[in-house]
A protein has these predicted regions:
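N-terminal Rossmann NAD(P)H-binding glycine-rich loop of SDR-like oxidoreductase domains
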Residues: 3-23
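Glycine-rich Rossmann NAD(P)(H)-binding loop
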Residues: 6, 169-174, 198-209, 234-242, ...
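NAD(P)H-binding glycine-rich loop region in Rossmannoid oxidoreductase-like domains
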Residues: 51-91
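Catalytic helix-loop patch of NAD(P)-dependent Rossmann-fold dehydrogenases
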Residues: 83-101, 108, 116-164, 169-171, ...
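NAD(P)-dependent short-chain dehydrogenase/reductase
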Residues: 121-126, 152-209, 214-223, 241, ...
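Mid/C-terminal beta-alpha module of Rossmann-like enzyme folds, strongest
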Residues: 184, 227-268
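Conserved C-terminal active-site "lid" loop/helix of NAD(P)H-dependent oxidoreductases
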Residues: 214, 233, 246, 268-296, ...
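Amphipathic terminal alpha-helices
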Residues: 294-317
Length: 317
């Protein structure tokens, strides 16, 4: 099968490309235009893509002529979305519409959305099922909710098969240290290497999140592409919540450091959800289940960050 992956050079995309190539597909990997492609192309054909340009999207789709598209490209940071809401919307919402509109009839599209779109759901009404109304409470979440509507409408009127993966929090080796657990892992790796004082700077640790390993996420996306029903939304989540405090404590323990944990006001979001917990029953019904223990995820994340340290740089990232 000819497969196009957008956002292929990103955290999840790079893992997905690796798995799809391993499964024997002809993979066309589209990364952000103007950015360097991975040194190891992994058997995929790489292309530059600017989702804010209809011309760029049309060129990539024409070249790949895909039977299936995994659309992962997007602005993925809640924090960054507060600084640039218009740019976030153009990339995530309008960019998705550009992709969906360019696909030939009969193509299959898996849109990767976000559980942030649910907004602040009362704790007693969680875990959250897919039929929950969307009430996004940050610019990133709003852009992802709009992307879903755009893709599903294109599926109705454009003759493409659209499946939506509404993903909850995920982490693991390869994650950018702009994101919480990857940042903590990088700081601890630097502390362990003697390159920083033993202080771990964190944000809000009272928040509880449904956390899943990136490799389990990729398995879910492949399963949804193969078996997901067109027009349906599927939560991609572990079905269990843990506080960020628990995750930090376990990460510190794994690191073997005695780092002191300090809250950095700069890391606290203007708006944060106290609990985000998903119901993964619909996805499990397709035969998927999480396979990687959370402690293994944290250990792999820490070692990945440690392998990319430059101890001459500060630990603030």
């Amino acid at each position: 099968m000819r497969v196009l992956v957008t956002g292929a050079a990103g955290f999840v995309g790079s893992w997905l490309v690796r798995d799809l190539v391993g499964d024997g597909h002809s993979v066309y990997a589209a990364g952000q235009a103007g950015h360097a492609f991975p040194a190891d192309r992994g058997g995929a054909e790489w292309m530059g893509l600017d989702v804010t340009s209809a011309e760029s999207v049309a060129e990539v789709v024409a070249r790949a002529a895909p039977d299936a598209v995994f659309h992962l490209a997007g602005q993925a940071s809640v924090g960054d979305s507060f600084h640039d809401p218009l740019g976030t919307w153009d990339v995530n919402a309008t960019g998705t519409l550009r992709i969906a509109s360019a696909l030939p009839k009969g193509a299959r599209l898996l849109l990767v959305s976000s559980a942030e779109a649910y907004g602040a759901v009362p704790e007693q009404e969680q875990p959250i099922a897919e039929d929950r109304p969307l009430r996004p409470c940050n610019p990133y979440a709003a852009s992802k909710a709009a992307a879903e509507m755009a893709a599903l409408q294109a599926g109705e009127s454009g003759g493409i098969q659209v499946v939506v993966a509404r993903s909850f929090n995920h982490t693991g080796p390869g994650q950018d240290p702009r994101f919480a657990l990857a940042s903590f892992a990088r700081q601890l790796a630097l502390i362990r290497a003697g390159g920083a004082e033993p202080v771990l700077r964190v944000g809000n640790l009272s928040a509880r999140r449904d956390l899943l390993d990136v490799r389990d996420v990729v398995r879910a996306y492949v399963r949804l592409m193969d078996s997901g029903a067109p027009g349906r939304v599927y939560n991609v989540c572990s079905g269990a919540a843990r506080s960020m405090r628990e995750a930090v404590d376990e990460l510190v323990e794994i690191s073997g450091t005695r780092a002191r944990v300090e809250v950095d006001p700069e890391r606290v979001r203007p708006v944060d959800l106290p609990l985000l917990l998903g119901d993964n029953g619909r996805l499990r019904g397709l035969g998927w289940a999480p396979a990687i223990p959370f402690r293994q995820t944290l250990s792999d994340l820490l070692e990945w960050q440690a392998g990319r340290l430059d101890t001459r740089t500060p630990a603030a990232a």
